[in-house]
Amino acid sequence: MNLINPSSTSPSKQSKRKHLLRIGLGVLILLIILRIALPYIVLNFINNQLSNINGYYGHVDDLDISLYRGAYIVKDIYIDIVDTTTQKQLPFFSADNIDISIEWKSLLKGQIVSELVCHTALLRFTNNASEPEQLERDSNDFRLMLRTFTPLKVNRFEVFNGKIQYLDPAASPPVDIFLDNTHILASNLSNVEDTTLLPATVIATADIYEGKMNFNMRINALAIDPTYDLNAEIKNANLVKLNAFFKAYGDFDINKGMLDVYLELAAKDRKYIGYVKPVIKDLDVVGPEDRKDSVLRKLWEGIVGVAGDIAENPKTDQIATKVPIAGEFGDRT
């Protein structure tokens, strides 16, 4: 008679099973602790990076991580410019949140790239009298700041409810002009889906003083030299809303008028060519001493930076000019 129950478990097997259970439980606890601590680790890393950008200071208030999406969300972020002379901080960029994630459709094609989605973002350029080269530096440095948020190349970038603002507090009167309700979508920036000369696209729309702005560009974002083909238009902007700008830079007032602007520009091999065409409708300037033609000349120069031939259509009360643009980019730095 067999006294050994074949269904019973030997002490050694029970001990091994308990050991494996302890290991599994320990790993689970470790993962839970890591999951809880990870947002704080990443948040401290990002804030450390943002506080050590030369000429800038930034901070993120909070951060959420979504492991199943391969994503994290930074909340209430701001980046200020630090004036090297006065050490005063000037607002440069802010956003309610930025969602940074792996772009899964590119991963399926064997490319590991990221996408960024910004909500309620503000990009502000300030004409700082103490640092006249600040505007150019701001434009060049902004794309470098994106690397703070992700070690991966950014292939897709989208902005919802954005605002792009230009301030000149030293002007008389102070100038504050902006594009509002801005939506920007840049795709294939890393040339994942297309390898043609201009594989990436940038599409943007915005409100501008009761008018609309549309912007379309094809670009090679990875090219060493600027390589792009763009067109943009502003339709039905109310010139009266821009009076502070014209008073400060043109020394005249506008009582009535609507503005359209058409722009085409292409760049390749360190050269660029295109044109800008402003069109003004129903213009009425303030002050009987002001001549319309001299005001128009100032207006063109204020808009495009150079003088152009002015054509007037009395039947439609519309005045327009077309200014060619051509030149070469400066030396690489």
Please provide the spans of the model-predicted regions.
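Extended lipid/amphipathic-ligand handling interfaces
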Residues: 50, 63-67, 95-111, 127, ...
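Short beta-strand segments that buttress and anchor functional surface loops
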Residues: 76-79, 200-208, 217
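N-terminal type II signal-anchor transmembrane helix
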Residues: 2-55
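Short acidic/polar mixed-charge low-complexity motifs
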Residues: 56, 209-211
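Secondary-structure transition motifs
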Residues: 2-12, 73-185, 280-306, 320, ...
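Short extracytoplasmic
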Residues: 56-80
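A short, polar/charged loop/turn motif at coil->beta-strand junctions and beta-hairpin connectors
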Residues: 52-54, 68, 73, 89, ...
